C-alpha cells in the first residue's frame, strides 16, 4: 500500500514540475509573445523576459520584432511603353504590432512578399522604361507607400 501511495505521489510531483516548467517561458529582447486564452487573444503582447503561460489554458505564439529581409524573385514586367523587363527586389519590413500580425493575417511574411510582388508589377507596369531608369527613387517611394498602406492592418 505504501509503495502505491509513494509512486502516486511521485507521479503527482513529476506532473506538477512538468506543468510549472511548461508555464514558464523566456522571451528575448527582440521577441514578443501573443497569448491566446481559451482561443481568444489577450489584447497586449507579452515580453521580453519571463512570461507565464498557463498551459493548457493558454497558447503563445512568438513573434520577432527584428527587421526581416525578404528577397522578391525576379518578375517579368511589361512597362507602359510595351518593353519587357525582368526586375527583382528586396523588401525590408518588421512587425510593429505583434497581436495584429498573428490575428489579422495567416502568414505575414508570405503576405508581405505577395503584396510586394503584386505592387512591383503594378507600379512598374504604369511607367515607361525611361522613367524607371531615370526616376528610381520616386518609383521606390511609391512602392514603399503602397506596401505600407496595404500591410499596415497586419501590424
Each language-model region and where it sits:
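N-terminal hydrophobic membrane-entry segments
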Residues: 1-155
Amino acid at each position: 500500500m505504501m509503495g502505491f501511495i509513494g509512486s502516486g505521489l511521485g507521479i503527482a510531483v513529476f506532473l506538477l514540475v512538468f506543468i510549472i516548467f511548461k508555464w514558464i517561458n523566456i522571451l528575448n529582447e527582440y521577441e514578443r509573445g501573443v497569448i491566446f486564452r481559451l482561443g481568444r487573444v489577450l489584447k497586449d503582447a507579452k515580453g521580453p523576459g519571463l512570461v507565464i503561460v498557463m498551459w493548457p489554458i493558454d497558447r503563445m505564439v512568438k513573434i520577432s520584432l527584428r527587421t526581416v529581409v525578404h528577397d522578391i524573385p525576379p518578375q517579368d514586367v511589361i512597362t507602359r511603353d510595351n518593353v519587357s523587363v525582368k526586375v527583382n527586389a528586396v523588401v525590408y519590413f518588421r512587425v510593429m504590432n505583434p497581436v495584429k500580425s498573428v490575428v489579422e493575417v495567416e502568414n505575414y511574411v508570405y503576405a508581405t512578399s505577395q503584396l510586394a510582388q503584386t505592387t512591383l508589377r503594378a507600379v512598374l507596369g504604369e511607367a515607361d522604361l525611361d522613367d524607371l531608369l531615370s526616376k528610381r527613387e520616386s518609383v521606390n517611394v511609391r512602392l514603399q507607400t503602397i506596401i505600407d498602406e496595404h500591410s499596415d492592418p497586419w501590424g
